[in-house]
Amino acid sequence: MEFSDTTYSWSGKTVLIVEDNETSNIYFEAALRKTKANLVWAKNGLDAVEMVKKNNQINLILMDINMPKLDGIEATRIIKGLFPEIIIVVQTAFILSGEERLCVDAGCDEFITKPIRLKYLLDTINRYLASPKET
């Protein structure tokens, strides 16, 4: 799917992508690069928590659930406890019974299942990052 450079414009916004799968990272980078958002990465929940503590410019986190060291649910709980204003969009390929409820209880703002449709991903993020006049 193609979109113009102005369809989704998040210049000045920082998106942290927390994902341990290299293929998913390539997809997210390709999907988000035209948005002009500053993209940063963490390979697991523990790294994400540390990065958020050090970088107060993060506006939105795209968080995987199943990762080593610290899973996305616990990372979400910790980050939301420290910085409730950061938007967290959880994305996962595994739908276990009650998993979405656990994510919501941990504080996630959105829950997306893989495979992720590009337009749905961009529209979801845009709800949080677009300037008021753009929504």
Predicted segments with their positions:
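Conserved acidic carboxylate
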Residues: 19
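Short hydrophobic/Thr-rich beta-strand motif most characteristic of the beta2 strand and flanking loop
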Residues: 36-43, 51, 112
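Active-site beta3 strand of CheY-like receiver
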Residues: 56-62
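Receiver (REC) domain active-site loop signature in two-component systems and cognate sites
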Residues: 67
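C-terminal output helix
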Residues: 116-125
